[in-house]
Amino acid sequence: MTKRYWNIILEEMMEAGVHFGHGTRKWNPKMSPYISAKRKGIHITNLIRTARFLSEACDLVFDAASEGKQFLIVGTKKKAADSVARAAIRARCHYVNKKWLGGMLTNWYTTETRLQKFRDLRMQQKTGRLNSFPKRDAAILKRHLAHLETYLGGIKYMTGLPDIVIIVDQQEEYTALRECITLEIPTICLIDTNCDPDLADISIPANDDAIASIRLILNKLVFAICEGRSSYIRNS
């Protein structure tokens, strides 16, 4: 993996509050190497380590994107949802930002069946065919379509398992992370001071509660993905 420069600036991370961890009582001792201080009952993340692992993650996603690999970004809590959708759309990645449906990856056949149903209903809506059904049936199908749009809208173009999964909050998305581990799908995970750094392939120590922090980390990763995609197109 070639090392590149990703313009990761410590002052910028400090302004975004990337260094603020959880309260000192809510911490995982495994995070000790990534913590630089305690301040007013809060752990402070070592931003030098954050910059290092974020840079490694950017190198990884650049290389993967330059080979045409597919990405899935997962972040379902309210503070992360909008940033996840925007970042994924910008980099043409798949995303889940509402609710992780158990077995979404490990039971891919069921997910694929749901996606096919979703595509069929969308096509029927586009062509106006839904309106040809009896009123009650049409209403049921439209509700079902809205439900599928909410939970599967971000993966509607996904035709197989992703090559790399980016996870915004390890604890919130633990089910998704476990599925990736089971399937041996490489993961990049934002980890706060209450997380286990050993679970993901690349763990980025960062504040996973502040919108500005989440957005900054995602923007760096997405920029690297976009650069990799451009390289892939040039070399195709």
Swiss-Prot record:
Keyword Ribonucleoprotein attributed: yes
Pfam families, alphabetized: Ribosomal_S2
MF term (GO), any: structural constituent of ribosome
The keyword Metal-binding belongs to this UniProt entry's keyword annotation: no
Localisation per UniProt entry: Plastid, Chloroplast
Main location: plastid
Any one Gene Ontology BP term: translation
One of the record's GO cellular component terms: mitochondrial small ribosomal subunit
Record key words, sorted: Chloroplast, Plastid, Ribonucleoprotein, Ribosomal protein
HAMAP family membership: Ribosomal_uS2_B
Family: Belongs to the universal ribosomal protein uS2 family.
Protein name: Small ribosomal subunit protein uS2c
Source organism: Glycine max
GN (gene name): rps2
